Amino acid sequence: DKPAEREDYSYQKQVDWMTDWLIANNFKNLTFFGQDWGGLIGLRMVANEPSRFDKVSMGNTGLPYNPEAPKEVLEKIKEFRESSLKLTPMSMAKEISEMDGKSLSQEDTEFHPALKFMYWQKFCWDTVDLPTGLLMTNMMEKNSRLNSAAYYLFVSLGLGKYFPFKSDVAKAYEAPFPDPSYKMGPRAMPSHVPTIPDQSLEAQRKAREVFKNWDKPFLSVFAGDDPVTNGIERDVLSMCPNAKSAPHIGGGHFYQWTRPKELSNLLINFINT
């Protein structure tokens, strides 16, 4: 029930599908909230159909726009993606943690965040049987070191599906993928995050122009302790001058899971005011 080819997946296709869904259902007077891809795709959808939305809120996401990435950064990313380096979940996670607080617009080529995010992109694409359960439980739950180490060992041996002590979260995130052929989406989509200039550049510019002139309520709700997106919040507030920033609530990247009550209360107050 999932497209099986890499070419089936792109940022633009996801935006088109969601915009078509929005129009087909004729939804109006909406309050939007997006996180992660929900923001990258959803904010573009909002920009396509702004009259359907009364309020916008988002967090741990953004509309990356980096038209002038340093040439040295582009060359390093290209070389890295084509390399034979084999990444593990642990080695990838270490590099991603060092993205913290950095902005795509910075000129420091040694510490440019795209040079860290490329580890996530390469890991996902090169790993045919992406360990979705292991990745998600590590980001969303507090597991014992013994359990995490044992799960990692099973995955390393190609036996991840046989690990007997999976949490319900791990099982839930593995359930949509009966075998590796179903995992093309999570493998392919990270490479479409526009941390460097790509085919989405002009569409990103146009969407950001909508939010530059946005005159309706816009709430930025970031966790504040997510190394992947901490550096994006400043860009969001700059992109939308009308945006207000909510207090950081913690909880890491998937804070809608780890801080559901705190996030819900912020959004309920935003909707009701």
Across the structure, where does each feature detected by a protein language model lie?
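Catalytic histidine neighborhood in serine/cysteine hydrolases
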Residues: 239-253
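C-terminal alpha-helix
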Residues: 266-273
